[in-house]
Swiss-Prot record:
SUPFAM superfamilies: Tryptophan synthase beta subunit-like PLP-dependent enzymes
CDD domains: ACCD (cd06449)
Protein name: 1-aminocyclopropane-1-carboxylate deaminase
Keyword Chloroplast: no
Subunit comment: Homotrimer.
Known uses: Introduced by genetic manipulation and expressed in improved ripening tomato by Monsanto. ACC is the immediate precursor of the phytohormone ethylene which is involved in the control of ripening. ACC deaminase reduces ethylene biosynthesis and thus extends the shelf life of fruits and vegetables.
Enzyme Commission code(s) on record: 3.5.99.7
Gene coding for it: acdS
Functional description taken from the UniProt entry: Catalyzes a cyclopropane ring-opening reaction, the irreversible conversion of 1-aminocyclopropane-1-carboxylate (ACC) to ammonia and alpha-ketobutyrate. Allows growth on ACC as a nitrogen source.
Catalytic reaction equation(s): 1-aminocyclopropane-1-carboxylate + H2O = 2-oxobutanoate + NH4(+)
Cofactor(s) the protein requires to work: pyridoxal 5'-phosphate
InterPro entries recorded: ACCD_DCysDesulf, ACP_carboxylate_deaminase, ACP_carboxylate_deaminase_bac, TrpB-like_PALP, TrpB-like_PALP_sf
Species this chain originates from: Pseudomonas sp. (strain 6G5)
């Protein structure tokens, strides 16, 4: 496998830390050891997160092409758009963000706090659009790019989750390589890796990266899209493409992609009671914050799998914390009493 053939523009502090979740592990019976790899604190750019790792492999292309404006898309509380705005500010580029109405939720300040607030503070041109949730290419995003061209700019397109970009999976191949090095330092290997999946490239990169040492099926995706067929197909497609890019040496098959669909309900962006319990439990036991859209659902999935005995006793499980805590502000009513 050859990831080093691709240029990387450093936007993170370096390898994200791995920390034990000792109190959560004990609370759940102590038979499974839980750890977290902290992508939520991987960068000094507006709280970082998993998209910042992905952008390290996209930005060299933007610079090489002489682009002056990063154009991206997401929901109103998109973590991706916040991270794109931060990177644009850091590089001295302009930023246009399309924020669609992906979530059927209306807190009084939903479109004024959290991720979207930070994007505005960082100087992004934020455009609200009424279109609903979809993980594909969107007309509103294409129009934003044509607007930049009409105004004499040169846009660089960054799709939702970076996932439709040819290099969208590379960052999390690097994640797997980091984990292998950290395992040498820790003196053990993780039996399972748990990760949230929606647009697909995070899990796709992990599948490829861990396929290099035979652990692709140990990457357990927790669907948060509530459109699992579309998400799984996208993970598989991106993983196959990424495997070719990094010269993995074998084909990625459907069996390599594990996606648990039990925890996404009722729909994208809306937490269920298990999501909220997981957010409160992890927060109160570990001081680690997760959000109602993504990480709260993957944390719920991991907690329930431990409770149900789905991880063999003695397993060491690595939770990929992808970030997203700024979105908590947009769900303040749900946590008005803690």
């Amino acid at each position: 496998m050859n990831l080093n053939r691709f240029e990387r523009y450093p936007l993170t502090f370096g390898p994200s830390p791995i920390t034990p979740l000792k109190r959560l592990s004990q609370h759940l019976g102590g038979k499974v050891e839980l750890y977290a790899k902290r992508e939520d604190c991987n960068s000094g750019l507006a709280f970082g997160g998993n998209k910042t790792r992905k952008l390290e492999y996209l930005i060299p292309e933007a610079i090489e092409q002489g682009c002056d404006t990063l154009v991206s898309i997401g929901g109103i509380q998109s973590n991706q758009t916040r991270q794109v705005a931060a990177v644009a500010a850091h590089l001295g580029m302009k930023c246009v963000l399309v924020q669609e109405n992906w979530v059927n939720y209306s807190d009084a300040v939903y479109d004024r706090v959290g991720n979207i607030e930070m994007s505005r503070i960082m100087g992004a041109d934020v455009r609200l659009d009424a279109a609903g949730f979809d993980i594909g290419i969107r007309p509103s995003w294409e129009k934003a790019m044509s607007d930049v061209v009409e105004q004499g700019g040169k846009p660089f397109p960054i799709p939702a989750g970076c996932s439709e970009h040819p290099y969208g999976g590379l960052g999390f191949v690097g994640f797997a390589e980091e984990v292998r090095q950290q395992e040498k330092e820790l003196g053990f290997k993780f039996d399972y890796i748990v990760v949230c999946s929606v647009t697909g490239s995070t899990q796709a990169g992990m599948v490829v990266g861990f396929a290099a040492d035979g652990r692709s099926k140990n990457v357990i995706g927790i669907d948060a899209s509530a459109k699992p067929e579309q998400t799984k197909a996208q993970i598989l497609r991106i993983a196959r493409h990424t495997a070719e890019l990094v010269e993995l040496g074998r084909e990625i098959t459907e069996e390599d992609v594990v996606l648990d669909t039990r925890f996404a309900y009722p729909e994208y962006g809306l937490p269920n009671e298990g999501t909220l319990e997981a957010i409160r439990l992890c927060g109160s036991l570990e001081g680690v914050l997760t959000d109602p859209v993504y990480e709260g659902k993957s944390m719920h999935g991991m907690i329930e799998m431990v409770r149900r005995g789905e991880f063999p006793e003695g397993s060491k499980v690595l939770y990929a914390h992808l970030g997203g805590a700024p979105a908590l502000n947009a769900y303040s009513f749900l946590f008005r009493n803690g």
